[in-house]
């Protein structure tokens, strides 16, 4: 019994440790081509660059939406991008697929490409991108287009032909289709089909109910192609990208007739030196700082609930009660299996989209157990052990549970705001979680999964589940609610805080403020599809085209 207790503790540690290390490429290192690095000519360190006094557009945040947005706007207008992080060559490890898990590990130093924090719900390991290209440079590379529900319910007046064209603009540069999948992924795909997650949709980027293999922003050699490469499509004469430039606040002018309008932004470099830069007539400041950064910048600049701002001694520019509200994160429910034989590390291109709303994704890893705690369980000289693991990740789509964001600091934007998502506060979300777990239960009974069972001394076969066991009765609401709340983790698919028809209008202009727009996931009330990065990059391109069309019409009227 003591031995089993030790093994259980070991397995629990392995679950945490190996999830953090579970994507490693088998491919050799290959350098970026010159064409892919053309955008480097546009990048300047903030402490080495003196900006012009004014630009047509200032994009705050060179992330997943900001890069395609800036590249598009630069076709006809001058654009300045202000990015708080460095570029990928300050963090060369983020380029390779084998380093993905390490990049997602909690990072606390101010120079890391990701910034970690814990939600007020007590869920740890949430991260914000802090690198040019944003979260597209530190994620797992899964690429899939948005779903119909998303497009019908965002409040944005989409032109679906333009949406399709914008997706294709992104995909021709960044997206790769896996030629094949690993043994584990093939087994999971077969199991999903066996339990009725139908039809088999093959290899597609579209969001379709059933089982499919999707795209990836990692190529066949294991190199990442993030949103930063979309800057290669820019007009280099019109675009300047400043890294290690942290925007502190937005400055407004005000008149009784027109209300507040953006005048300029204030930012500082890595040495703490402050700069101010303005916008030209008919220009805009566009926030693309993400679901945490964009509402945070509005709040520190005096746009938000007046009572909260006053309590922090922030001068109120515009009373906007919905800034920081409707914060949503899709809950993730994990099932981890120790496998009886070595497997090839795999990404996440296989997904099952169930008819009940939940999505099932998967990955596998073979992790060397060389952690600092090994000597505690295996006296020296302890043998190296490769732990093979298979994972199921269940995603609750379109959760109805929502929370809010508020400032920890009234002036220091380097401090991530407090955020509470209220995971599983609504019964609809618990039912989706229960559906995902019930699907796991069915999957474990399929022929496709038989090969992953262990045998005990009596010849009985069993799965070695690592972590909390699935409840015996998945139809019991209370036991499932407890299970879901105790096992919840993040899918990193945050949205909200500047939602449409609350903070911004259908054209993503901040209501009541002139010259200010928000273009990123903070305007969404649900995360698009199985993974938001495709739609977030599409949004940047889509809005860049739309803004130019608006501007051309406006200039033509003058």
UniProtKB/Swiss-Prot annotation:
EC annotation from Swiss-Prot or TrEMBL: 1.1.3.-
Cofactor: FAD
Tissue and organ expression note: Confined to nectaries.
UniProt-annotated catalytic positions: 493 (proton donor), 531 (proton acceptor)
Gene3D superfamilies with a match to the protein in the record: 3.30.410.40, FAD/NAD(P)-binding domain
Highest taxon listed in the record's lineage: Eukaryota
SUPFAM superfamilies: FAD-linked reductases, C-terminal domain, FAD/NAD(P)-binding domain
Binding positions (FAD): 64-65, 83-84, 131, 135, 139-142, 247, 492-493, 532-533
Glycosylation (residues): 76, 180, 308, 386, 473
Signal peptide (UniProt feature, chain positions): 1-28
Function of the molecule: Involved in the production of blood-red nectar containing the alkaloid nesocodin and that serves as a visual attractant for pollinator visitation, including vertebrates such as Phelsuma geckos. The nectar is initially acidic and pale yellow, but slowly becomes alkaline before turning into red within 24 hours. Together with NEC1 and NEC2, facilitates the condensation of sinapaldehyde ((E)-3,5-dimethoxy-4-hydroxycinnamaldehyde) and proline to form nesocodin, a pigment with a stable imine bond. Catalyzes the conversion of sinapyl alcohol to sinapaldehyde.
Record text on subunit structure and interactions: Monomer.
Protein name: Sinalpyl alcohol oxidase Nec3
Species assigned in the record: Nesocodon mauritianus
């Amino acid at each position: 019994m003591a031995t089993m207790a030790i093994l259980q503790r070991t397995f629990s540690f392995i679950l945490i440790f190996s999830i953090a290390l579970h994507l490693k490429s088998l491919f050799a290192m290959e350098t970026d081509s010159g064409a892919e690095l053309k955008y480097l000519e546009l990048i300047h360190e903030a402490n080495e660059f003196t900006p012009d006094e004014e630009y047509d557009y200032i994009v705050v945040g060179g992330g997943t939406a900001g890069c395609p947005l800036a590249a598009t706007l630069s076709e006809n207008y001058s654009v300045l991008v202000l990015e708080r992080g460095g570029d990928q060559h300050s963090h060369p490890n983020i380029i390779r697929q084998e380093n993905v898990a390490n990049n997602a590990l909690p990072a606390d130093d101010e120079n890391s490409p990701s910034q970690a924090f814990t939600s007020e719900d007590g869920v740890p390991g949430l991260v914000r991108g802090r690198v040019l290209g944003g979260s597209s440079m530190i994620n797992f590379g899964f690429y899939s287009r948005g779903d119909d529900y998303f497009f019908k319910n965002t409040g944005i007046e989409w032109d679906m032909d333009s949406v399709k064209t914008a997706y294709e603009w992104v995909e021709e540069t960044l997206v790769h289709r896996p030629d094949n999948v690993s043994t584990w992924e093939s087994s999971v795909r077969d199991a999903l089909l066996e339990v009725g997650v139908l039809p088999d949709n093959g290899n597609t980027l579209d969001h379709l109910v059933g089982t499919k293999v999707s795209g990836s922003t990692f190529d066949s050699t294991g190199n990442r192609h993030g949103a930063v490469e979309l800057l290669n499509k820019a007009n280099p004469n019109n675009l300047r990208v400043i890294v290690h430039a942290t925007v502190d606040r937005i400055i407004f002018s005000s008149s009784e007739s027109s209300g507040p309008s953006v005048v300029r932004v204030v930012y500082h470099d890595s040495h703490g030196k402050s700069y101010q830069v303005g916008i030209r007539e008919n220009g805009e400041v566009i926030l693309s700082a993400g679901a945490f950064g964009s509402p945070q910048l509005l709040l520190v600049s005096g746009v938000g609930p007046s009572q909260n701002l006053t309590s922090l001694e922030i001068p109120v520019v515009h009373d906007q009660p919905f800034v920081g509200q409707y914060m949503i994160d899709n809950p993730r429910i994990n099932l981890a299996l120790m496998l009886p034989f070595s497997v090839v590390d795999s990404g996440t291109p296989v997904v099952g989209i169930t008819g009940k709303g939940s999505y099932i994704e998967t990955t596998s890893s073979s992790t060397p157990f060389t952690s600092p705690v090994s000597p505690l369980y295996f006296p020296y000289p302890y043998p190296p052990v490769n732990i093979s693991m298979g994972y199921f990740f269940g995603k609750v789509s379109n959760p109805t549970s929502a929370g809010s964001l508020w400032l920890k600091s009234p002036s220091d934007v380097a401090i991530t705001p407090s955020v509470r998502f209220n995971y599983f506060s609504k019964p609809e979300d618990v039912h989706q979680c229960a559906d995902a777990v019930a699907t796991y239960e069915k999957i474990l009974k399929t022929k496709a999964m038989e090969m992953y069972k262990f045998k005990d001394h009596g010849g009985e076969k069993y799965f070695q589940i690592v972590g909390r066991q699935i409840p015996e009765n998945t139809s019991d609401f209370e036991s499932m609610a407890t299970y879901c709340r105790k096992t919840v983790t993040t899918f990193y698919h945050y949205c909200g805080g500047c939602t449409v028809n609350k903070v911004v209008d259908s054209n993503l202009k901040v209501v009541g403020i002139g010259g200010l727009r928000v273009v990123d996931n903070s305007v969404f009330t649900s995360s698009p599809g199985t993974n938001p990065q495709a739609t977030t990059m599409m949004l940047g391109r889509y809005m860049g085209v739309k803004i130019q069309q608006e501007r051309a019409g406006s200039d033509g009227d003058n």
